[in-house]
Amino acid sequence: MGSPCALGLFCCCSSCFCLCCPRHRPASRLAAVVGGATAVPAVVSGVTGLILSPSPSPIFIQPTPSLPMSFHNPGLELALDSRPAPLAPLGVTSPSAPPLPPVVDLPQLGLRR
């Protein structure tokens, strides 16, 4: 077994690396550790993320920042706007531009305006 860490996980030096353990915490705070652990919650520089390990290969932190609801982001407001924004002035076309991806309905993802 190992010793419990701040996240309530056990640090087993032979099989996994716990990012909150000072012994295994990388100096750069970017997790590039090797192990066969499954998705384990971790905190890296105040941003919550998951260690994803589909196979016994190097695993990395995928940051999942949680923004407060009062955070003002003009880009997000544009994305939530139901009216399409003009991409170019009238009469100007760009035939080499790739097609736009389909619009994701944000309420289906559990986000509220």
UniProtKB/Swiss-Prot annotation:
Q: Which intervals of this chain are the motif PTAP/PSAP motif?
A: 95-98
Looking at the UniProt record for this protein, which Gene Ontology cellular component terms does it annotate, in alphabetical order?
host cell endoplasmic reticulum membrane; host cell plasma membrane; host cytoskeleton; membrane; virion component
Q: Where is this region: Interaction with host HPX?
A: 27-67
The compartments listed are: Host endoplasmic reticulum membrane; Host cytoplasm, Host cytoskeleton; Virion; Host cell membrane
Superkingdom of the organism of origin: Viruses
Q: What is known of its domains?
A: The PSAP motif is necessary for the release of membrane-wrapped virions from infected cells.
Complexes and interactors: Forms homooligomers. Interacts with host SRC, HCK, FYN, PIK3R3 and GRB2 (via SH3 domain); binding does not activate the kinases. Interacts with host AMBP/bikunin and AMBP/alpha-1-microglobulin peptides. Interacts with host HPX/hemopexin. Interacts (when phosphorylated) with capsid protein ORF2. Interacts with host TSG101; this interaction plays a role in viral release from the host cell. Interacts with host SIRPA; this interaction down-regulates the phosphorylation of host IRF3.
What is the designated name of this protein? Answer: Protein ORF3
